[in-house]
UniProtKB/Swiss-Prot annotation:
CDD domains: ABC_RecF. One of its GO terms (biological process) is SOS response. This is DNA replication and repair protein RecF. It is found in: Cytoplasm. The RecF protein is involved in DNA metabolism; it is required for DNA replication and normal SOS inducibility. RecF binds preferentially to single-stranded, linear DNA. It also seems to bind ATP. Pfam families: SMC_N. The keyword Manganese does not apply. Disulfide bonds: none annotated. InterPro entries: DNA-binding_RecF, DNA-binding_RecF_CS, P-loop_NTPase, RecF/RecN/SMC_N, RecF_2.
Amino acid sequence: MSGVQLSSLSTLNYRNLAPGTLHFPAGVTGVFGENGAGKTNLLEAAYLALTGLTDVTRLEQLIQSGEREAYVRADVQQGGSLSIQEVGLGRGRRHLKVDGVRAKTGDLPRGSAVWIRPEDSELVFGPPAGRRAYLDALLSRLSARYGQQLARYERTVAQRNAALKAGEDWAMHVWDDALVKLGTDIMLFRRRALTRLDELAREANAQLGSRKPLTLTLSESTTPETYAHDLAARRAEELSRGATVTGPHRDDLILTLGELPASEYASRGEGRTVALALRCAELELLAEKFGEKPVLLIDDFTAELDPGRRGFLLDLAASVPQAIVTGTERAPGAALTLRAHAGRFTEESRPATVGVGA
């Protein structure tokens, strides 16, 4: 299967990265250096430029101290054509362009990158909100309609919560009708998508050497069949709390390892393996949907992993058309190796046809 390729990445005033352009070959690019050298920021910038997505709470966090704006640009080969994707950051907003034309996040290729990082363990051990966010982000990339319905649902929940806080019991039937329609769509889409996601995650978990089978299920606070009834039944509680307590915004993605919930009983190593399995499933699901392998971004390939699982990650990187792998050690077998230091990247080795500037 062919894949998306990040031909080059340019940054200006982005975190601690020095301004400049990096050119990437097909295959594996290894980036090594001490912690704080800019390796993670490089992957974050690449992911932002490829997808338009970031999980920071304030965009100002991405802009270098003392600067008002930042900029990232990716030259992307996909589907046999080259596109230029630009993201400008400033005044609390993102400004996207594709080939010089203003765009929205949904206009960028939705299956262009997958980012594996040590923090993924929080998908296993963290609160339900993190697992919901993972699932919703993935499904929004698989289906633009899902993302649109989710945004409408979240706006409706916020408006209903405002009415609950104001004690507007008389208005609840209006909000309830909208909530049931949107929430039912979300629940049904999640159920359909989870069937394949569960299969792929189970396969990846086994390939990673886990002896305990992994199962993904949804813990739902209501069902499409009972949603309207459940909202009415908890009306008094919701008016008292000033919040909507029933619906897909309260659901959880349950990760079961063997017969026990991984969030409570998995070891740190097992949790890291489960998180890797989720990202591998994400990679395959996006490839199945869009017909091309995403660019694979792997942050700190040695973190919390034994040699066998490190080997799996490196084999995974070698199996896709393009990957960028960071670590405190050199990634073996890389087509291009870059040393990171203070936000700058210098070539250790590269194919003769590839130029990299920093």
